[in-house]
Amino acid sequence: MAGRYFEEYVPGMVIRHSLGRTITEMDNVLFSALTMNTQPLHINEDYAQKHSAFGRRIVNGIFTLGLAVGISVPELTEGTLVANLGYDNVRHPHPMYHGDTLYVETEVVEVRASRSRPDQGIVRFRHTGRNQD
């Protein structure tokens, strides 16, 4: 599916993305290695079992964020985005584990003309990721 254009967005619009993605151990370990994140909660099962509140390794939260945004791309911005201006208010209220499947829904929070580029618009999204439960 191709992304939507500025004129197609309306504040309050909610898109439940059709894609879901199961997170594997390899996803988590490779992402942690590529980003040089040596946090043992992500890569050391023995440590996580003995020293974490979760009792096992958790998926790197930044991987989860990136995956959530990626899941949204085909139905939101694929081929239509000029630039991603940033993220704010990122929270990880619950851990993701190896074998969890991430599903995402996006709410359109704001749609407005750009002040610095009058021929372009700005759309603010609220992405919410959830596991299979």
Placement of each model-derived feature along the sequence:
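HotDog/MaoC-like acyl-thioester-processing domains
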Residues: 1-11, 92, 96-133
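Hot-dog-fold acyl-thioester-processing enzymes
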Residues: 1-86
